Amino acid sequence: MAGRLQVEVRLQDGVIRAVDTRLQRPLAQLSRLLVGQTAEAALARLPLLFSLCAAAQQVAALRALERAAGWTAEPEVERGRSQLTELELIRESLLRLVQVWELPLPLERLKVLVALCRRGAARLQPLTSFRAPSLPADPHLQETLAELAAAWADLELPITADWLGPRLGRWQEVVLGGPPPAVFDPADLSALLAQLRSGDTRASIAGQPRITGPLCAAEAQLSAAAQIEQHVGALLRHTAQAIDSLQQPSPPPAVAGLLAGEGVGLAQTARGALLHRVCLDEGTVGAWQLLAPTDWNFHEDGPLRRRLCGVRVAEEDAGALLRELILAVDPCVAFEVKIIHA
């Protein structure tokens, strides 16, 4: 289901005076499509609702539904599901790096890496069924993961500054504002759960925004050029780390304090942490809530507002700067930029 991001900036005398971030996501409509369904029927609908991060959406939903139903998946099942989301993360990150940031990766090499990700994901697809049993030992999967690691190790990629330098040079003198929000921590889940139970689906903890994903690994930089370079470099490092951890992916964090019939599922995407919260009532969905990385990273008081307010930029460059920073934070929806000259 599509959403849209609108970012409006008020510029006065060459200084950004205000940043208004409006994220429109059809989460209420999505919930209505899933409420009243059985777990199996709801899972069957998910691929029709999401195109980006489709595997992560399935895995987060599965974890939430199974927990709500009182079912604990076997460790090997959870391991395979984490491998599935990591393969999707790798594929989507590589495509983003090449298509948006022009990573100098030869097309044939990219095709090989993407094909290996898809081949591995196909072997793991049976684990996306409700209460899935463990899969038998799969030498073809292990061979695919080994080929992917070898293909990545064989690459000789330049450092981020070398290939991004010409594109970002115009932003070297643009000095950014204050630091971004704090990082979303699974330790905050109990506070977040209390909010969700009350019907508050805002992406914040005690009213304060958080950030997630590769964005968290990017150190706050003084210049816009250095900040964008940090974001893109963090995405590249995140991809490499996912490839390295494929054989032993991290288990999902435990969620304590759940009520009877309530389940929470977490999964990692190329953009950060994805969360589904589900309540089952006699086998059917009574409530369904979702928080995606874009909800966190494009909060109205998120990194865009905090880093851009008070920034001095030439009027003719404001739109281009804003677009580059939005691309660096990486929304999962289409976006539009509006500059108001006060």
From Swiss-Prot:
GO function terms (MF aspect): nickel cation binding
Domain of life: Bacteria
SUPFAM superfamilies linked: HydB/Nqo4-like (SSF56762)
Disulfide bonds: none
PANTHER family, per database record: HYDROGENASE EXPRESSION_FORMATION PROTEIN HUPK, HYDROGENASE-2 LARGE CHAIN
Family (UniProt): Belongs to the HupK family.
Annotated protein name in UniProt: Hydrogenase expression/formation protein HupV
